[in-house]
Amino acid sequence: MSQIVTRFAPSPTGFLHIGGARTALFNWLYAKAKGGKMLLRIEDTDRQRSTKEAIDAILEGLTWLGIDWDGDVIYQFARAERHRQAVEEMLSRGNAYPCYATPEELDEMRELARKEGRPPRYDGRWRDRPASERPTDRKPVIRLRAPQEGVTVIEDQVQGTVTFPNKDLDDLVLLRSDGTPTYMLAVVVDDHDMGVTNIIRGDDHLTNAARQTQIYNALGWDVPRMAHIPLIHGPDGAKLSKRHGALGVDAYRDMGYLPAALRNYLVRLGWSHGDQEIFSTEEMVEHFDLDRVGRSAARFDFQKLENINGHYMRASSNAELFDAVMGLIPHLPDAEHRLARLTDARMEQLRAALPGLKERAKTLTELLDGAEFIFATRPLLLEEKAQAVLTAEARAHIAAMIPQLEAADWSAAGTETVVRAYAEQAGVKLGAVAQPLRAALTGRTTSPPVFDVFAVLGREESLARLKDQTA
């Protein structure tokens, strides 16, 4: 059996959207699971819409997700001459022909089809015209001489057997009148030349599969195995769109998701292995196959993604998480402000705070928000809830504790011993003093455990913040 070769072939007209990322992941996993290769092709034939920025975003998105490819990136536009050679071959076989229909004639065909309530199709008027009738004042398009009877059958690894009556498929354009190849042709020639054995893509390409199969047959080439995976829908069941929220992989990165978590979430969008939800990359590769991909659309669930991300954050080592936070900061809107405040001392405080922070946060941005107390400058701006907690009685408790804290062994355990002893001596519950301490130290009513905050901020800064609220 020949080596499995898959490909991911995005068009660089925007960011790497979440559906494309899942398609790339499925291709990557299938190749890895079968001991094969995944190739990357940039389908940049739309010169107006294809941009270098979009190409960079795709490459960066794949790299961030941990999806690598084999060999050099293939650029479709650079292969236009090869695409034209394939058309010459079809012309010589009699499987393609020049068509001189004018734009006006094509409009008339469309209008007639609309009136008769049928899909617009080219009527084949130049299919069998003799060369003597060809006009000399305009250049033709080149069309495929598609079969008009029978059916084109796709044996799809996800959708099963899909049959297309050939009468419903017209003679599609292979080369435009200016000599540029169409997408439909370029895809077939590139997949053949790249040795692609398996095409895995969204089921919005299913009709394309029938047309492309006809091109393969016209060239006498083997047709790769195809698998058309269902699209991703929003939580409301509609096709995933901008109104459902973030779409690009870069947006999920900037929202503080970990690549391993997003990878894990994406693999479960349409594929399953029993009831297992959390997969290491090794487990994905071990278990992935197309027979476990469903036919119905998968719904994107942000809450589930958050929960999976929270799991990966808690499972990450503090060193890994610190690196992830440092990697995220340059991509945040206030990156310059954050980086300016990121002194060596504060970086060490952030490292020290991570064990407590990661237990509460579901994303890196939530974690950074929870760490804001480290970067706050005195006197702290108090949130409304924190102001409400710092009553006159609460401030009096803080003032009474300061001398005892000044003498404490400065650690989470040491400060906890002092505060618990004070609460017992004062005849109040621990929360009655711990919550005001939290508000005075962080300006908020939510934070990592208050004794961890003492340890992270250190003796001098902690006592100074407490004194600010009792002055």
Curated annotation (Swiss-Prot):
Top enzyme category: ligase
Subcellular localization(s) per the UniProt record: Cytoplasm
UniProt-annotated binding residues for ATP: K242
Locus of motif 'HIGH' region: 10-20
Signal peptide: none
One GO cellular component term noted in the UniProt record for this chain: cytosol
EC number(s) given by UniProt: 6.1.1.17
Chain positions of motif 'KMSKS' region: 239-243
InterPro entries reported for this sequence: aa-tRNA-synth_I_cd-bd, aa-tRNA-synth_I_codon-bd_sub2, aa-tRNA-synth_I_CS, aa_tRNA-synth_I_cd-bd_sf, Glu-tRNA-ligase_bac/mito, Glu/Gln-tRNA-synth, Glu/Gln-tRNA-synth_Ib_cat-dom, GluQ/Sye
Reaction(s) the record says it catalyses: tRNA(Glu) + L-glutamate + ATP = L-glutamyl-tRNA(Glu) + AMP + diphosphate
Gene Ontology biological process terms from the UniProt entry: glutamyl-tRNA aminoacylation
The UniProt record lists the keyword DNA-binding: no
GO molecular function: ATP binding; glutamate-tRNA ligase activity; tRNA binding; zinc ion binding
Ranges where the record places region Disordered: 117-137
Record flagged with keyword Transport: no
UniProt KW keywords: Aminoacyl-tRNA synthetase, ATP-binding, Cytoplasm, Ligase, Nucleotide-binding, Protein biosynthesis
Role description: Catalyzes the attachment of glutamate to tRNA(Glu) in a two-step reaction: glutamate is first activated by ATP to form Glu-AMP and then transferred to the acceptor end of tRNA(Glu).
Family from the record: Belongs to the class-I aminoacyl-tRNA synthetase family. Glutamate--tRNA ligase type 1 subfamily.
Subunit-structure text: Monomer.
Stated name of the protein: Glutamate--tRNA ligase
Organism: Azorhizobium caulinodans (strain ATCC 43989 / DSM 5975 / JCM 20966 / LMG 6465 / NBRC 14845 / NCIMB 13405 / ORS 571)
